[in-house]
């Protein structure tokens, strides 16, 4: 299997950095390239903050997009245009969607905000499409080829893998960093550089962009070098693929080849279950998510500098292959684990993974997006079965037409605005960010920074005044 020939690089700028279920994309850029990184098409769109979204001064100091505070373009219009463009680009031939730290940030924002706007949230990894987080590859390169780039080194002695820092060390002009389109260009140039320097590493990385490709890579690779970095610190393991979890097709069960093979094979069924339940550093098992980018490469091709000799790791991998009954036992044990239950979310903005919209509603969504008259859209909203869909539909209509709506929709929208702007919750707090603005005015004294801080502060004060007197 070869990875897709089309690559779609995307990046966002947002109203905030924290409270990620409630911050909003206000700029999105995408670049479509071929497999040789030649640009085929691009898009760069922006919008105003939603009436119930609180912009934060720190975020605007980073991306400087204060013009969006007065934009006439709505969030719905922007998200719909992104969705339509991505579907057009990947319709005839699937694509790989590439972000930088996107699986922790941008990708989740796109998904949730497609969900808010009654659009398919999983456009980037369905219908043959794949998704990759370039940060994972950059971290692998910093470990396997530390001299390939003159990486900036942090106070802990580790390479800095922030996009702006890495491409700056390659000699690119980063004066316009944190503009979504500029960051897309940086990603293209960085991946092009990696491909020229280490084509096999990049090919394997891009193959892993889909679940099928990732499973193929795991299955054909005798010893896999796996860099696990949940936070600032990372661990590297030599692992072998055992199989897919029969009850969760997104999980690959692997075994750590560092452990004495006799000890692992002699584990009781209960011990196997216990280690699978907590596949941490002390466990001989590791669980790989097939639907997210991982830091993985062929340890027989690339030197991970494992303490255990490579010949011994290969011998261990072969011995596991000689024990198919034991492998089956491990896979059966993975099916006996209790599925983790996450606490229910009280706010519909956060419920994307709790329950998917039904087929009937999804069919109506497309009619809603295509409808031209307000009357038709209101009628379609009334036909939605899922109460969340009705609420999101009403929010969309309020963005687009605040005056000609039924009184109950206007009333519920104003109640939502008042709740977000005047009460405490999981969303950004106006008081917190007004205080932040005051502090930043003393810390960031350049005229350009002062202009940004004052613009956001004025927006917050004007809107809270309107809410309190509305």
Question: Regions from the language model: what does each represent?
Answer:
Residues 51, 140, 193-197, 260-263:
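Short loop/turn segments at secondary-structure transitions that flank enzyme active sites
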Residues 14-16, 103-104, 136, 186, ...:
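Short, glycine/acidic-enriched loop or turn micro-motifs at the edges of active sites
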Residues 96-103, 147-213:
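Acidic, Mg2+-coordinating catalytic module of metal-dependent nucleases/exonucleases
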Residues 103, 109-164, 168, 222-223, ...:
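Internal, well-ordered alpha/beta segment that forms a basic, Gly-enriched binding/recognition surface
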Residues 1-119, 160, 168-170, 267-384, ...:
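Conserved non-catalytic scaffold segment of RNase H-like nuclease domains
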Residues 47-70, 132-182:
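Active-site-proximal helix-loop-helix substrate-binding element of RNase H-like nuclease domains
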Residues 207-280:
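Acidic catalytic cores of enzymes that act on phosphate-bearing nucleotides/polynucleotides
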């Amino acid at each position: 299997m070869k990875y897709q020939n089309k690559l779609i690089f995307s990046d966002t700028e947002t109203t905030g950095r924290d409270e990620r279920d409630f911050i909003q994309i206000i700029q999105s850029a995408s670049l479509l390239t071929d497999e040789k990184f030649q640009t085929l098409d691009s898009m760069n769109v922006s919008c105003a903050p939603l009436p119930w979204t609180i912009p934060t001064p720190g975020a605007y100091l980073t991306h400087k997009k204060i013009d969006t505070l007065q934009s006439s373009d709505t969030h719905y219009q922007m998200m719909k245009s992104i969705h339509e463009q991505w579907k057009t680009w990947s319709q005839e031939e699937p694509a790989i969607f590439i972000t930088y730290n996107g699986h922790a940030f941008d990708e989740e924002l796109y998904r949730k905000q497609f969900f808010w706007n009654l659009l398919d949230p999983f456009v980037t990894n369905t219908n043959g499409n794949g998704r990759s987080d370039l940060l994972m590859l950059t971290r692998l390169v910093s470990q396997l080829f530390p001299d390939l780039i003159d990486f900036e080194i942090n106070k802990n002695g580790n390479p800095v893998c922030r996009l702006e820092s890495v491409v700056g060390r390659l000699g690119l002009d980063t004066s316009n960093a944190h503009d979504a389109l500029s960051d897309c260009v940086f990603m293209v140039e960085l991946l092009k550089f990696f491909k020229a320097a280490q084509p096999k590493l990049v090919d394997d990385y891009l193959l892993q962009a889909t679940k099928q490709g990732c499973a193929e890579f795991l299955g054909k690779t005798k010893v896999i070098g796996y860099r696990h970095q949940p936070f600032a610190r990372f661990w590297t393991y030599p692992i072998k693929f055992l199989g897919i979890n029969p009850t969760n097709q997104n999980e690959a069960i692997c075994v750590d080849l560092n452990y004495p093979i006799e000890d692992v094979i002699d584990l009781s069924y209960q011990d196997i279950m216990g280690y699978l339940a907590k596949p941490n550093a002390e466990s001989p098992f590791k669980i790989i998510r097939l639907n997210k980018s991982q830091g993985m490469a062929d340890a027989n091709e690339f030197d991970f500098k494992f303490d255990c000799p490579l010949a011994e790791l290969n011998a261990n991998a072969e011995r596991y292959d000689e024990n198919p009954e034991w492998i089956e036992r491990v896979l059966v044990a993975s099916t006996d684990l209790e599925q983790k239950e996450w606490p229910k979310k009280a706010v519909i903005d956060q419920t994307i993974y709790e329950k998917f919209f039904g087929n009937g509603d999804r069919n109506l969504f497309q009619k809603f997006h295509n409808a031209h008259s307000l009357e038709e859209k209101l009628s379609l909203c009334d036909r939605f079965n899922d109460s969340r869909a009705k609420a999101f539909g009403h929010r969309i209509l309020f963005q687009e037409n605040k005056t000609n709506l039924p009184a109950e929709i206007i009333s519920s929208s104003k109640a939502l605005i008042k709740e977000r702007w005047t009460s405490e919750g999981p969303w950004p707090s106006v008081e917190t960010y007004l205080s932040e603005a005051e502090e930043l005015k003393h810390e960031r004294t350049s005229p350009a920074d002062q202009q940004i801080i004052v613009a956001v502060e004025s927006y917050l004060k004007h809107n809270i005044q309107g809410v309190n007197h509305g």
